[in-house]
Amino acid sequence: MDLMLNGKRALVTGGSKGIGRAIARQLALEGVDVVIAARNQAELDAAAAELAQETGRKIVGLAVDTQDDVSVKAVVAGTIAALGGLDILVNAAAKPGGQATPPKLAEITDALFFDDVNVKVMGYLRMAREAAPVMAAGGWGRIINISGLAVRLTGSTIGSIRNVAVAALTKNLADELGPQGINVTVVHPGTTRTEKTPGVVAARVAASGLAPEEVERRMAANVTIGRLVDMAEVADIVAFLASPRSVAINGDAIACGGGSKGAIHY
């Protein structure tokens, strides 16, 4: 299927590593020129050079702190200057979830909570607020928010709250921006294989004495496909949602964790 993405222009926050980088790569392979944005300029420069060499597309790394409105305005303006416009925004800049033991109620300080929400929820809102008028002026756009399956699970109070908030933000934006040609969706990855996974597995092997294969099997114990989803497979879904082919999907949530056992979502 031709996703009709050739020549589109995208901004991917959290794009220097992990799922964000995988999304930037897949978009570029589909013919999209991409700005990847994150905090560390050196990591951005290295990732941009590697992705440009692999895909043959224009890949630019721009530093951003999505907690700061001035920085957000600058990265959107920089994207327009670098690419000549902006058609697609992927919000993937967030504190990683699922790696450490989530804090219990007594351990959740105001600062911990608000810092996490400021990065993911307010950060996504700031980016959309700045990018949407550019897309509306062109009559077309896509905004994809990367959230996570903590939205449907207990066990991480902050993780669940922030991800539910991202889903609510997504639906509100979709209703407001849909008539202007801008579709907004939210994607919920589960535990996903990224470049960090081998290190996580090695640490658990050292702590438990289990074989690496058994550690990974346990990590995917509640995944119905029987293994972890790879970040490239998440990127495939996002590339479709970023395309004109996805016009029938707006304001909805797409889970891409390989299937959660037992739960029924409708």
Describe each model-derived feature in a short phrase.
Residues 95-96, 110, 142-166, 170-179, ...:
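Catalytic loop of short-chain dehydrogenase/reductase
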Residues 119-137, 174-175, 243:
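Amphipathic alpha-helical dimer-interface segment in Rossmann-like NAD(P)H-dependent oxidoreductases
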Residues 73, 94-114, 137, 158:
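Conserved mid-core segment of classical short-chain dehydrogenase/reductases
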Residues 106-126, 140, 144, 166:
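Catalytic Tyr-X3-Lys loop
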Residues 18-19, 102, 239, 250-266:
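Short C-terminal tail/terminal secondary-structure segment
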Residues 178, 183, 249-251:
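Short, small/polar-rich loop/turn modules that mediate ligand/substrate recognition or access, typified
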Residues 41, 63-75, 110:
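The beta1-alpha1 cofactor-binding region of Rossmann-like NAD(H)/NADP(H)-dependent oxidoreductases
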Residues 3-35:
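Canonical Rossmann dinucleotide-binding motif of NAD(H)/NADP(H)-dependent dehydrogenases/reductases
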